[in-house]
Design a protein with these regions (language model features):
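Hydrophobic cores of alpha-helical transmembrane segments in multi-pass inner/ER membrane proteins
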Residues: 2, 8, 67-78, 133-147
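Cytosolic juxtamembrane helix and N-cap/initiation of the first transmembrane helix
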Residues: 2-37, 156, 167
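Juxtamembrane helix-break-helix junctions at the cytosolic face
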Residues: 16-19, 77-100, 153
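Individual transmembrane alpha-helices with interfacial aromatic-anchor signatures
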Residues: 24, 97-98, 123-139
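Hydrophobic transmembrane helix segments
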Residues: 36-64
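Core segments of alpha-helical transmembrane spans in multipass integral membrane proteins
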Residues: 38-40, 60-83, 100-104, 108, ...
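Cytosolic juxtamembrane helix at the C-terminal end of the final transmembrane segment
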Residues: 83-88, 145-166
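Membrane-helix boundary connector in multi-pass membrane proteins
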Residues: 113-127
Length: 167
């Protein structure tokens, strides 16, 4: 027919398949983030001084590092559990609580840290350029991971959360 435009859809796959791929990618990215963050804290707990301008760590910072290492292990486990088949053994509310908790804590820490660094510093500092955005990235990854998990759960059925249809 003249004047009719047809749009050919080359994607025969279900749209949920793409979102599930994003879920898996985000889960592994969050796992890598937690692993890197944990390794940094292990280095500091073992006496490393990189980032401390040559100063040694006090007792309080040592304990903070130990707590951070434990939280990194939990968050890395959570990231994998949300995208691996073995993760179905755990209640989704437990995994989602962990993911949303990481999102809020890391997001707030990164966001507030960026604002604080901007207000206190006249020049670009290591905190502003690397540390604070790294916290923010972790918060974004865990928030996205939790959202995508909810979106793709129940075999793609429409999910309602707080009366809002998420699909």
């Amino acid at each position: 027919m003249k004047g009719v435009i047809t749009i050919k859809n080359n994607n025969d796959r279900h749209p949920l398949d793409k979102i599930e791929k994003w879920l898996v990618f985000t889960g592994y990215a969050a796992f890598v983030w937690s692993t890197l963050f944990g390794l940094i804290h292990i280095y500091w707990a073992a006496g490393g001084t990189l980032g401390f301008e040559g100063k040694t760590m006090g007792e309080v910072l040592f304990i903070i590092n130990l707590v951070a290492i434990a939280l990194c292990i939990i968050s890395a486990f959570t990231a994998l559990a949300l995208v691996q088949a073995w993760g179905r053994r755990f209640p989704s509310w437990l995994l989602l609580t962990s993911a949303w908790g990481a999102c809020v804590v890391l997001g707030l820490r990164g966001g507030v840290g960026i604002i604080q660094s901007l207000l206190e510093s006249e020049s670009l500092s290591l905190l502003l350029v690397i540390v604070e955005p790294f916290f923010l990235l972790g918060g974004i990854l865990y928030g996205l991971l939790a959202f995508l998990y909810i979106y793709t759960s129940n075999n793609g059925k429409k999910i309602k959360q707080n009366g809002i249809n998420m699909r």
